[in-house]
Amino acid sequence: MAKNDKLGALGGFRLAIILVGALTLSNCAGKPGDGTNDPFETVNREIFDINMSLDKAILRPITQAYVDVVPDPIRDMVNNLLFHLKEPVTLASDILQGEWDRAGQTTARIVGNTVIGFGMWDVMGSSGAEGHKEDLGQALAVWGVPEGPYLVLPILGPSNIRDGAAELAQSLYDPVDFVTDTYLDYDTNFYVSGSRTVFTAIDKRAQVLGKLAELEKTSLDFYATIRSLYRQKRADEIRNGESGDAVPIPEITLELDEPMLSEPIAQTSKK
């Protein structure tokens, strides 16, 4: 108990530092004149090229094999489970934004899909309680925190200062990680979190497997296209709007889980 209390206090301090830092940097950034909000474009493009090279060399072939080998019903179950595991974050964001109707619906989904669907079948969605995604970045936007400059993060892809800080805070305070951290030993928890991270990346990549290649083929400036689509997508999500026929944003995303963040750098920096 003492250990958990100590970690909780340290985690709270880290969360405060992250969010205050994001707010400060976002406010100091100012508004760009060209509307792209990309003052770090030169560095961003270099990171983008590296990310795409990693995608083509590693993530895309793995995802293609996953799609080719794993039957659709199994992939649907994996997708449902990963979505289900993120719904506690959605619930917290719903509450932080004062969206009580959506919070109630998310609560019903968590309970119903856990008890009846075992997390792998969206029985509540079939009953009319459709799922939605919310995150801390959206809550900060509703609170008036500006997005700050556009960023391309190594491995993680398109982001900005506000959303990047929010994603880091979420990784430190993911409710599912809290449960596994409490009931599993460190090694088991690390492998469970790692598996979740890997399958999340593969599942997200599978959603845009053909679309990303087509988008790259038809874009005069692939980097600028992704930047524009990302910013449109985030603005739409903050408004709780529908994306309509917009092309989904290709993601090369590895969600950071706390056990992975706490692993010594010497052990995690090498691929």
Task: Tell me the role of every PLM-derived stretch.
Residues Q138, G144-K271:
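A structured, mid-to-C-terminal "fold-capping" secondary-structure block
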Residues H84-R162:
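Mid-length scaffold segments of soluble, non-membrane domains
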Residues T24-N27:
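C-terminal motif of bacterial Sec signal peptides marking the signal peptidase cleavage site
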Residues A29-G33:
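Bacterial signal peptide processing site
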Residues G35-P61, A65, F83:
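Post-signal peptide N-terminal segment of mature Sec-exported envelope proteins
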Residues A2-A16:
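Bacterial N-terminal signal peptides that target proteins for export
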Residues A16-A22:
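Sec-dependent N-terminal signal peptides
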Residues N79-L81:
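Beta-rich strand-turn-strand
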